[in-house]
């Protein structure tokens, strides 16, 4: 069975997709994004699927596609809330998981104005993002084997740090 080189987790706006693409290129590997698997299967954007199904049904669908993604080699990037599902966290225990971390201020800045992320829709985006991070932080800590912060750092710097981590393993 195939096994990912590394799995990327982190909140919305942390840079998982950007880092994932660059990391896959640096490793000469494929990138599998669980959000893209959902979009391909449903023919709709993840945010639209989330809005239509509601969070519990969306998380169930997401868990199915996360399990599928974890059967690929290469780099795997998971949606920001994938770690909310216990079965996903159990599967991640068997993998090298890098937590792409970001501050509240930077995460809000990066996701400002994005209507494609209903999980971030709020009257007070800063407070909402802070609450989201407070809820998810212990879960990211639980599943990750390595943490990299993206604040004020270029994607190249973040990728270099992850590559160094992978070489040390």
UniProtKB/Swiss-Prot annotation:
It is an enzyme of class 2 (transferase). Monomer. It is found in: Cytoplasm. Belongs to the shikimate kinase family. Its EC number is 2.7.1.71. The keyword Nucleotide-binding applies. This is Shikimate kinase. It catalyses: shikimate + ATP = 3-phosphoshikimate + ADP + H(+). Its cofactor is Mg(2+). GO terms for molecular function: ATP binding; magnesium ion binding; shikimate kinase activity. GO terms for cellular component: cytosol. HAMAP family: Shikimate_kinase. Pathway: Metabolic intermediate biosynthesis; chorismate biosynthesis; chorismate from D-erythrose 4-phosphate and phosphoenolpyruvate: step 5/7. Catalyzes the specific phosphorylation of the 3-hydroxyl group of shikimic acid using ATP as a cosubstrate. ATP binds at residues 13-18, 117, 153. Binds 1 Mg(2+) ion per subunit. It holds the Pfam family SKI. Substrate binds at residues 35, 59, 80, 136.
């Amino acid at each position: 069975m195939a096994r990912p080189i590394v799995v990327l987790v982190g909140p919305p706006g942390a840079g998982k997709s950007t880092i994932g693409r660059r990391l896959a290129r640096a490793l000469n590997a494929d990138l599998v994004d669980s959000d893209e698997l959902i979009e391909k299967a449903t023919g709709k954007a993840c945010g639209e699927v989330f809005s239509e199904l509601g969070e519990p049904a969306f998380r169930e669908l997401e868990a199915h596609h996360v399990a599928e993604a974890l059967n690929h080699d290469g780099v795997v990037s998971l949606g920001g809330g994938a770690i909310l599902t216990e079965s996903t966290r159990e599967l991640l225990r068997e993998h090298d998981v890098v937590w792409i971390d970001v501050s509240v201020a930077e995460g809000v800045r990066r996701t400002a104005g994005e209507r494609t992320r209903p999980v971030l829709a709020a009257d007070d985006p800063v407070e909402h993002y802070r609450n989201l991070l407070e809820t998810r932080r212990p879960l990211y800590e639980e599943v990750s084997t390595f943490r990299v912060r993206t604040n004020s750092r270029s994607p190249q710097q973040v990728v270099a740090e992850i590559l160094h981590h992978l070489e040390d393993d």
